[in-house]
A protein has these predicted regions:
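Short beta-strand scaffold segments in enzyme catalytic cores
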Residues: 16-19, 47-51, 152-155, 159-164, ...
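A positional/structural detector of protein chain ends, strongest at the extreme C-terminus
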Residues: 411, 493, 526-531
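Composition-driven detector of proline- and glycine-rich
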Residues: 422-470
Length: 531
């Protein structure tokens, strides 16, 4: 029996800063304007594809995220495979895999069809894996990736990438070229703020088609605005000028969505939460006195944020304050590259950014923290294959660099050590200290010990919210359901009276909180917010 030929690869997503929207040729997927994007690291976000070719396969099949698709009706995938085989026959005519049917299995470790460039990662990974399978080296694959999904051509290069629209009717000059690699601007970071993991109502393909035929603003954008923005964006990247980079990114995102709204019927991708986050970012930049954070929205509600490394901790702490959620309480609010939250965000600062009227629980699901990365990579470990020896998807495939497996370090910035070792208000704080505290002092009235608190200056388990009228008062509130107590703890008042040492300890803690209150321009109530 002839040997089965297999290849497994991963490929990144890319987030455009100058948007691609609209085609001059739907079959060849030729864009009406140039676009520029940043390729994100596969350490956090990627598509993973395994392709096997075997003489025993009777037909070509594919599976996406564990579900078998209809290959016969997938015109774009068939066009990509046809183009890759044509190229392989020229470059590697003796490759035996060219004679066989294919089994293709692909998974994403991020939400699919939610406006996070899943098709870009998927088709770039398909093309690159086919190149590995057929032995194609040192070829520009971007024109073929483009036929699968336009933005996929940008994911074949790392760093910042420029996709040229080209002028040829056959598309040979519509290619993606690298402006700089991922190491050129090492301080650049990207946050993906996930507000909705569901599939968007209007696909990018449908939206583009409607826009090109109905929007009166569309031609003005592609003729007057985009060419100049591309020139300025290339200059900003070359100079590592974040102010210009950020402003151009946000302006182009705004105009892209304005064109979508000018489409008839309108294509509405952003939600009220999307707009709220955009407004908060403008407030953040105004408060900073310069553009230091930039949003951009693809065709979906989720927010992509470009910012420099030095801004990540403050921005994420601020965002967590505006959008508290279960993921934060469980230590999973930020996934990907770990961060340490800042210890406090002042009430005045929050007011400047919109105040308490902006605070809404569970409107942001989580944040993915990543950076710029390289293009696709081959994985040679057999355990990385998504297909079993029988050519069918594995029941429990190895997920590459899953963001679900990584959580951030809890808040501990002032101490620069893990929270297990910190001293807070003169008291050791952290998971292992909670048991010692309870053993020594008992459980205060109604108190319990939980996970992360609301991030107004809190270590794990405590939310800080100062009460201006009661600046010396400290209250520890319960956030857990009551648990059965032993007989010697049946009456908290009696126990408290019988144990003056515990009362003295809490009085000392209260005094220290009062002192801290005078040093910080926020109101504090030691209370884990119960919502």
């Amino acid at each position: 029996m002839e040997e089965v030929v297999t290849a497994t690869c991963i490929a990144p997503i890319n987030i455009a800063v100058i948007k691609y929207w609209g085609k001059r040729d739907d079959k060849l997927i030729l864009p009406v304007n140039d676009s520029i994007s940043g390729t994100l690291s596969t350490d956090q976000l990627c598509a993973k594809t395994t392709i096997s070719a075997s003489p025993t396969y009777t037909e070509t099949k594919y599976w996406l995220n564990g579900i078998e698709g209809d290959y016969k009706s997938n015109i774009r995938m068939k066009n990509v495979i046809k183009a890759m085989k044509k190229l392989a026959k020229k470059k590697c005519p003796k490759n035996k895999a060219l004679k066989y049917k294919l089994h293709i299995c692909s998974i994403n470790n991020f939400p699919t069809a939610a406006g996070l460039a899943s098709s870009a990662a998927g088709y770039s990974c398909l093309v690159y894996t086919l190149a590995q399978l057929y032995g194609i080296d040192n070829e520009d694959l971007t024109p073929i990736a483009r036929v699968g999904s336009g933005s996929a051509c940008r994911s074949l290069n790392g760093g910042f990438v420029h996709w040229l629209k080209g002028v040829s009717p056959t598309g040979e000059d519509s290619v993606a070229v690298q402006l700089c690699d991922e190491n050129y601007w090492p301080e650049m970071r990207v946050l993906i703020i996930v507000v909705n993991e569901g599939k968007k109502a209007v696909s990018s393909t449908s939206g583009m088609s409607l826009t090109t035929t109905t929007s009166e603003l569309f031609n003005y954008r592609i003729m007057k605005c985009v060419p100049e923005r591309v020139r300025l964006m290339k200059k900003a990247i070359a100079e590592r000028n974040f102010k210009d980079f950020g402003e151009l990114t946000m302006k182009d995102s705004n105009q892209f969505h304005a064109v979508c709204l000018d489409t008839y019927p309108p294509c509405v991708y952003m939600t009220d939460v999307s707009h709220r986050i955009a407004a908060i970012i403008h407030g953040y930049n105004k408060n900073a006195g310069e553009t230091c954070v930039a949003y951009t929205f693809d065709a979906g509600p989720n927010v992509c944020v470009y910012l420099l490394e030095k801004e990540v901790r403050r921005f994420v702490t601020m965002l967590a304050a505006f959008f508290p959620c279960d993921a934060y309480d469980e230590g999973k609010f930020v996934r990907g590259i770990p961060i340490k939250y800042l210890s406090k965000i002042s009430e005045e600062y929050m007011t400047n950014l919109g105040g308490s009227s902006y605070i809404e629980r569970d409107r942001v699901k989580y944040i993915i923290h990543t950076k710029l990365g390289s293009g696709p990579k081959r994985l040679d470990d057999p355990d990385d294959s998504l297909l079993g020896a029988d050519g069918l998807p594995k029941a429990n495939p190895k997920v590459q660099s899953s963001i679900e497996q990584e959580v951030s370090v809890p808040p501990c910035e002032p101490h620069e050590v893990p929270p297990e070792n910190v001293m807070y208000l003169g008291v050791p704080w952290g998971p292992q200290w909670a048991e010692q505290w309870l053993a020594q002092w008992g459980k205060p009235n109604g108190a319990s010990w939980g996970g992360h608190g609301f991030p107004f200056g809190a270590p794990p388990g405590i939310a800080i919210k100062m009460d201006a009228a009661l600046r010396s008062k400290v209250k520890i509130e319960s956030t857990e359901s009551s648990k059965s107590t032993s007989s010697n703890e049946s009456d908290d008042a009696t126990t408290s009276a019988a144990r003056p040492d515990r009362q003295n300890a809490f009085q000392d803690l209260e005094s220290k909180a009062s002192t801290l209150n005078k040093l910080m321009d926020v109101d504090v109530e030691m209370s884990r917010v119960n919502q």
